[in-house]
Structures are given as structure tokens and as C-alpha cells.
Amino acid sequence: MEKKFYLVREDILPEAMKKVVLAKQLLERKKAASVAEAAQLANISRGVFYKYRDAIFPFQAVTKENIVTLFFHLEDRSGTLSQLLSVVAAAGCNVLTIHQTIPLQGRANVTLSVSTNDMHEDIDELLAKLRGLEFVEKVEIVGSGVY
């Protein structure tokens, strides 16, 4: 039987599933030496861990071998695209395409397609850094796919 997949917001996930993701991260980052320790630190039973471990994955884990397309709404200032690309490059992303609109009324839209193969941080961390840039008014993921 073919399995179906859904992209679901974190705030509607059951607490047990969120804790399984936490336990998996603890194991991946070597903060826990065993499943038993990770389950204990995440405050779940080993049974819950084993029940859901192969069924839930953070979005960034699914995008490890993908192209991610990001949309930005930026203030039109000198050097903004350069700073934006520096943050993306520092995360280990390889920029594949750039599309920038002509600035109108002091604003410009930029769409970046990046390869996340060599990315060394979570996509959420990268998005937080990008949102922290003072000239970024909006950033969102508009697509992702395997190439």
C-alpha cells in the first residue's frame, strides 16, 4: 500500500509526536547516548518513541536533498541582496537561481532557489536569521522539491 504524506503545522501536532521529534534530535546531536535516555529526556516512553519514530520528520529533514525556493519582500537599499546572499551562503546553501523585481515604492521582491545539500543548520534557523535582517519585511518558503 502506498503511503501518503502531509505537511502539518507544529501547533496542531499531538504532544507525543513533538516529543518524539525532540528525542530523535537528542540522539542525532549526541545529547543522548541511547533511545532510553532520549525518551527519558523528552519525557515519553520508549514505546511511544518506537511507535512514531519512523512516521514523523521535521520539515528540514525532508529538505536535505532538495531545492528550496524562498520568497522575500525587501526594502530597497544598497547592498541588501549582497547581505541576504551572504547569510544564505554562510548557512551552507548553494544559490541556484535569483529573480529580483524592479524596486517600486522602495520595495523589491526576490525569489531564491537554493540547494540545501550542504546546509549545516536547520531551515528554521536560516529563516530566523533572514527575518532578523532589518531590511527583510517578509520571507517564506514557497516551494521545495527533489532534483
From Swiss-Prot:
<dbReference type="InterPro" id="IPR045865">
    <property type="entry name" value="ACT-like_dom_sf"/>
</dbReference>
<feature type="domain" description="ACT">
    <location>
        <begin position="69"/>
        <end position="144"/>
    </location>
</feature>
<protein>
    <recommendedName>
        <fullName>UPF0735 ACT domain-containing protein GTNG_2535</fullName>
    </recommendedName>
</protein>
<dbReference type="InterPro" id="IPR002912">
    <property type="entry name" value="ACT_dom"/>
</dbReference>
<dbReference type="Pfam" id="PF01842">
    <property type="entry name" value="ACT"/>
</dbReference>
<dbReference type="InterPro" id="IPR008310">
    <property type="entry name" value="UPF0735_ACT_dom-cont"/>
</dbReference>
<comment type="similarity">
    <text>Belongs to the UPF0735 family.</text>
</comment>
